[in-house]
Each structure stands twice: as structure tokens, then as C-alpha cells.
Amino acid sequence: MTIKLINIGFGNIISANRMISIVSPESAPIKRMIQDARDRGMLIDATYGRRTRAVVIMDSDHVILSAVQPETVAQRLSVKEEIIDEGQG
């Protein structure tokens, strides 16, 4: 299995293989999830003080805050997969 890395803004990179979901931080359940992760010490804030626009949930139970839109992160992931697929074919 190849390691796929995704840029989530400001030079911060995460492993796409470990990612479970990318969600918007607007809903109350996601806000509770962020607070719970902060209390447990499992929150990674990669926003550099900017507004949180995407919340990335990892399989290690870490919650990562990003300042880029969820659609942008998803697009970067799909472009990365297309490049890998073309290289194998």
C-alpha cells in the first residue's frame, strides 16, 4: 500500500490513508466532537489562527482542524488518486 499525503493548508500535510472523513465545523455535533477531542488532547489545530473551515477525522481518533474548505481537501485527495491510478495503468 502506498502512502498518500494531502496538503491541508499552510504546509500542513496528513496521511490520506488514515483519514476517515472531512466535515464542515458548523453543526453542533461536530462542535461537540471538537471540544471532546480538545479535552482528550487529541485535537490538532492546523488553522494558524484562521477560521476553521474543515474538520478532518482520522482513524487514530485524532481530530484535525483546517482553514481550507472540505471540498478543496476532497479535490486534492481525488486528484492525488487519479495521478496514482494513471501511474499504475
Curated annotation (Swiss-Prot):
HAMAP family: RemA. This is Putative regulatory protein BPUM_1466. It holds the Pfam family RemA-like. It comes from the Bacteria. Belongs to the RemA family. InterPro entries: RemA-like.
